[in-house]
Amino acid sequence: DTALITLDDVDAALGDQSSLTLDSLIDAVALGRVAAADQALTRLTAGGQTLQTALGAVRRHFQILHLATGLIESGTPQTQALSAFRPPLHFRRKPLVENQLRLWSRRKIERALALLHKSEIDARAMRAAGTRLPEAVAGQILLRIARAAQR
């Protein structure tokens, strides 16, 4: 009996599951998939990740979306603008990010970045005071951004 091995099987066996889950969260938020974002948040926290880490990862992604959007607005072809991502996008994520670029205007990205930046400043201030940004607050911020993608 021979079984077919899929790319998902390989990812599950070899991939860094925390980065896969973080990518799942980033893509769910940026695509406006609120339920999927909520599930990814649950998986991240169950795996020991802090949502402050997730906020930073989502912010970095939106910064690159902002850069790519600016390149596209100045006449750079979308495929070339996608090469601005560092590290380079995995081939499976390219279509997802292409969809994100269609969903997010420069202005919407700037609003999301302002919210993410403020939440990171608040988290740093709370950490300096010996407390942490409540996980629920960080999760609500990410879900709020996911809902904004739908508008």
Question: Over which residues does each language-model region extend?
Answer:
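Small-residue-rich helix-loop
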Residues: 2-111, 150
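Charged, amphipathic alpha-helical oligomerization/scaffolding segments
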Residues: 57, 111, 115-118, 141-144
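Acidic, carboxylate-rich catalytic segments that either coordinate divalent cations
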Residues: 129-151
